[in-house]
UniProtKB/Swiss-Prot annotation:
Its cofactor is pyridoxal 5'-phosphate. The keyword Phosphoprotein applies. GO terms for biological process: Mo-molybdopterin cofactor biosynthetic process; molybdopterin cofactor metabolic process. The modification N6-(pyridoxal phosphate)lysine is found at residue 246. Residues 650-796 form the MOSC domain. Belongs to the class-V pyridoxal-phosphate-dependent aminotransferase family. MOCOS subfamily. The modification Phosphoserine is found at residue 752. Sulfurates the molybdenum cofactor. Sulfation of molybdenum is essential for xanthine dehydrogenase (XDH) and aldehyde oxidase (ADO) enzymes in which molybdenum cofactor is liganded by 1 oxygen and 1 sulfur atom in active form. This is Molybdenum cofactor sulfurase. It catalyses: Mo-molybdopterin + L-cysteine + AH2 = thio-Mo-molybdopterin + L-alanine + A + H2O. The gene is mal. Its EC number is 2.8.1.9.
């Protein structure tokens, strides 16, 4: 049972619920308060009534409007427990604009550095483009947290000493995970600076010493102040950046930069730009102007969004009315403190329940991303980030979760939440993996490319506001249980497809990709030699227009059409000569070209069977005890093979007569020189579960499959009976019983016996991996079909 206790009494909860009836009317459960909280109905009604009642015009025209704006400044300072003689309030468009203002105007001098936390909003990374620092350093969260224990003056430092200035920027609360960096680090940094060599240098020239530098702190408080009190009497950052819609839900388009008196001293005396309202005068006929004396007036370019600013007053009133101060155990608990308790309690409840969600085999459903747990409110806020796993362990893409949630009316957030550094940290992405995701795979911020080779590129985030109810959290838990623990993957995908028309446009596109897709085709022109791969966008080495490859009556065109035999006419395989895997085929310009390893020199053969037959003698061999008839491909290629493989008397044969076998649906299936069936299918999820210490592509190559797919669950292919890829129907012939050939690394020829033992362990002693499939032939598809990488795989 959960230990959750409501922060609100019954009357308070009823009053809050009355303000958000639109959620029930729209059958919506809102769980993205870190994105924006929701506005109360009475809040926007009162704001609209004021606009209808009062004459609110340009503050340069009407002093009344200016008075309203000043009221908001005073109220904001009171909200953060400070006064106008300690902090200036500069109105901006949002927290991003506030960060930009700091970056543009902070005076680093000649030796000052810019330091920022890895787990920061993208806008902090954007500051790097504008700061004029000598060097830039990325700090890990624990490096900043460590500064909280540095002995320092209780309230930081009051001023600056001669010397240059360094700036440290971090988020009070991580918008990815909800982790709160101890604000005591602010005074530690201001008083002691940062230890020399702390952090990773990203750019610039490291100064010989920073001992004389003054250290300033820019606090990105946008996520934090939405649900937590910020006491600027206790903690005194030099700059505080906020967005009001995070706190009140309405209005949007207005934020603020709070600048301490100390922080103001570190701003440049001259600006690179000035707008209307920021100057005493500016001559058009000469480069002469004078900025305003009042600090905030120098930086509020142009006319302020005064209607939005006036609307903030009702936001403050609404919070204080719906979540009033109350006495607890003789102490006074203010509005934001109560909201902090409320959202933390919900997050704690959710985290405990998520940990209890498990599959029948004991596999946890949820992978949580959290630094310190949910026991301490001063360390963790009302945000829970996670991913979902299958019963076999691989991840489910966050795009699928977004689809399932949307169909249940649950609004949550997926991706990296404009915090790639936190994604990198929590998902364990090294620099190579980051390049693979963003540069090679082409993922961009905000898209739904959620899994790359089974690696999540983001997460699912739920976050809470003062109006979130426990019932909302329980509905999320119910969705996860019913959709994942009580429903099989194929049923879930079918339900999503049936209701896809109800999804937003971006999710409709993601829903279309939920079905497994054909990732890659591989043909092995010469039996037991390397593959020629066909991938989306075109085949390797120029084969397969657009990733498409034709089918013949025997399978994929040119697959296992040639084989190498010894002087006795017996087929040579990798069991006897592992170096066969180094013979790499290339199909182009009506030629089959063979190379050995990375050598540019090779030998060519015509693809046309008619051209080959004119000058070739016929001979016989056997494949799996069945006689086959073939054409000898000549002395040139025979000599080339013997030289590279070190075996005398080798010949290359090309199949000239068809083989056939009876499959499970009692059809005569025509075969090439394959051992058992027309096609071998392998699931990358199953390969991934082996967890070999080599690249996933290398492991996939070991299984020498023709058709490579990727599904949500490892080994689910073993349960298939029939499937359709694109427009082509297939019958499953059964699992592929493996031999020690899979112990050979297909890129090097080296053997590693643990491959077989791992499969045996995962399959309870059985040596099964991949499935044999055959095309279901009809009168309409005998000669005209093809497969294309990207085709959807439907299991029937």
């Amino acid at each position: 049972m959960s230990s959750y206790q409501s922060e609100y009494n019954a009357d308070e909860q009823a009053a809050i619920d009355k303000e958000f009836t639109r959620l029930a009317n729209n059958k919506s459960i809102y769980l993205d308060h870190a994105g924006t909280t929701l506005y109360a109905e009475s809040q926007v009604t009162a704001a609209a009534e004021q606009l209808q009642r009062d004459v609110i015009c340009n503050p340069h025209t009407c002093r009344v409007t200016g008075d309203y704006v000043d009221q908001v400044r005073f109220k904001l300072l009171e909200f953060f427990n400070t006064k106008e003689d300690e902090y200036h309030v500069i109105f901006t468009a949002n927290a991003t604009a506030a960060l930009s203002l700091v970056a543009e105007n902070f005076d680093f001098g000649r030796q000052g550095n810019f330091h920022y936390c890895q787990e920061n909003h993208t806008s902090v990374l954007g500051m790097r483009e504008r700061v004029q620092a000598r060097a830039m350093y990325m700090l890990k969260e624990e490096e900043i947290t460590g500064m909280a224990s540095v002995p320092s003056a209780a309230n930081g430092v009051s001023g600056s000493s001669p010397g240059d200035n360094s700036l440290v920027t971090f988020s009070a609360q991580c918008n990815f995970s909800g982790y709160k960096i101890p604000l005591a680090a602010i005074a530690g940094i201001q008083k002691q600076g940062l230890p020399h060599g702390l952090g990773k240098k990203i750019s610039g020239e490291a100064p010989q010493t920073t001992d004389n530098n003054n250290y300033y702190v820019c606090l990105d408080a946008a996520s934090f102040v939405a649900t937590n009190p910020l006491d600027l009497q206790r903690y005194r950052p030099d700059y505080v950046c906020i967005s009001f819609y995070k706190i009140f839900g309405y209005p949007t388009g207005v934020g603020a930069l709070l600048v301490s008196r100390r922080g103001a001293e570190a701003f440049r005396k001259k600006r690179n730009f000035f707008g209307g309202g920021t100057i005493n005068y500016a001559y058009p006929h000469a480069m002469d102007h004078q900025l305003r004396e009042v600090f905030h007036q120098r930086y509020e370019d142009g006319t302020l969004p005064f209607l939005s600013i006036v609307g903030l007053l009702e936001g403050f009133r609404t919070l204080e009315r719906l979540v009033p101060r109350r006495s607890v155990n003789g102490g006074d608990v203010a509005t934001m403190e109560r909201i902090s308790r409320h959202v933390h309690g919900l997050a704690q409840h959710l985290e405990k329940q998520l940990r209890q969600l498990k599959y029948p085999n004991g596999q946890p459903l949820i992978e949580l991303y959290n630094r310190v747990g949910y026991e301490e409110r001063h360390r963790q806020g009302g945000i829970v980030a996670f991913n979902v796993r299958t019963d076999a362990g691989p991840f489910v893409g966050f795009g699928e979760i977004a689809c399932v949630a949307a169909l249940q009316g649950i609004l949550l957030r997926t991706g990296c939440f404009c915090n790639i550094g936190a994604c990198q940290r929590y998902l364990g992405l090294d620099e190579t993996m980051m390049d693979a995701i963003y540069k090679r795979a082409g993922r961009i911020c905000g898209d739904y490319y959620d899994l790359i080779d089974g690696q999540p590129t983001g997460a699912v985030r739920v976050s809470f506001g003062y109006m979130t109810r426990r019932q909302d959290v329980d509905e999320l838990l119910k969705m996860l249980h019913l959709s994942y623990l009580a429903t099989k993957p194929q049923q879930r995908l079918q339900l999503i497809e049936e209701q896809a028309g109800e999804l937003p446009k971006a999710l409709k596109e993601r829903a279309q990709r939920l079905r497994p897709q054909l990732l890659q085709l591989a043909i092995y022109p010469v039996k037991s030699c390397a593959a020629f791969k066909i991938e989306e966008g075109g085949g390797s080495g120029g084969g397969g227009s657009g990733g498409t490859w034709p089918l013949t009556a025997q399978g994929l065109q040119y697959d296992r059409e040639w084989m190498i035999v010894d002087m006795n006419g017996m087929a040579v395989t990798q069991k006897r000569c592992s170096e066969l895997c180094l013979i790499r085929p290339l199909i182009r310009d009506d030629q089959l070209v063979l190379h050995f390893g990375d050598s540019p020199d090779g030998v060519s053969l015509p693809l046309s069977l008619a051209d080959q037959a004119e000058n070739s003698s016929r001979c016989r061999s056997k494949v799996c005890r069945q006689p086959v008839e073939g054409l000898d491909c000549g002395d040139e290629v025979a000599l080339w093979l013997s030289q590279h493989l070190g075996l005398e008397g080798l010949r290359l044969l090309r199949q000239s007569s068809q083989r056939s076998t009876t499959n499970g649906v009692r059809q005569q299936q025509k075969l090439s020189l394959v051992n058992q069936a027309q096609f071998l299918l392998v699931n990358r999820s199953s390969v991934r579960s082996l967890q070999f210490e080599e690249s996933l592509d290398e492991t996939v190559d070991r299984f020498r499959a023709n058709i490579i797919i990727d599904t949500g669950s490892a080994f689910e292919e073993l349960s298939y009976k029939q499937l359709t890829i694109g427009q082509v129907q297939f019958q499953v012939e059964g699992p592929c019983q493996r031999c020690d050939m899979i112990c050979i690394n297909q890129r090097t020829g080296e053997r590693s016996p643990e491959t077989l033992t791992t499969i045996s362990r995962l399959q309870s002693g059985k040596m099964r991996f991949g499935i044999y499939i055959s095309r279901i032939s009809t009168e309409n598809n005998k000669e005209s079909q093809h497969l294309t990488c990207g085709d959807v795989v439907v299991v029937t």
